[in-house]
A protein has these predicted regions:
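Short S/T/G/P-rich N-terminal loop/turn motif that feeds into the first structured element of a domain
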Residues: 1-75, 79-94
Length: 94
């Protein structure tokens, strides 16, 4: 498993829609294809325009499809709520 950090910028006023999808049965099913959801750590900026997730990825290709709009389940939601995202691979230094 790879530890990754995903930082997403949300469109104005779309935080609730984003979180609703991420916590829905449909969203959880897609997330489970990508990573171990029991280990995910999330954070949100005070203005609710940015989210950050540390995830433990077991399927890199599925993770890229999840965020880059090539996944047919996530695409309609991302088109509505997501401005941009960045993905970082994490490595422990100690």
């Amino acid at each position: 498993m790879k530890e990754m950090l995903v930082v997403g910028r949300l469109k104005e006023g779309k935080f609730e829609k984003f979180m609703g999808f991420m916590q829905s049965d449909k969203g959880m099913a897609e997330r489970k294809k990508v990573a171990d959801v029991t280990k995910t750590i999330g954070a949100v900026s005070p203005d609710k325009k940015a989210v950050m997730f540390k995830i433990f990825v077991h399927n890199i290709d599925a993770m890229h499809a999840f965020v880059d709009r090539s996944n047919p389940v996530t695409k309609p939601v991302w088109d509505e709520v997501m401005e941009s995202f960045e993905i970082f691979e994490l490595k422990k230094v100690r």
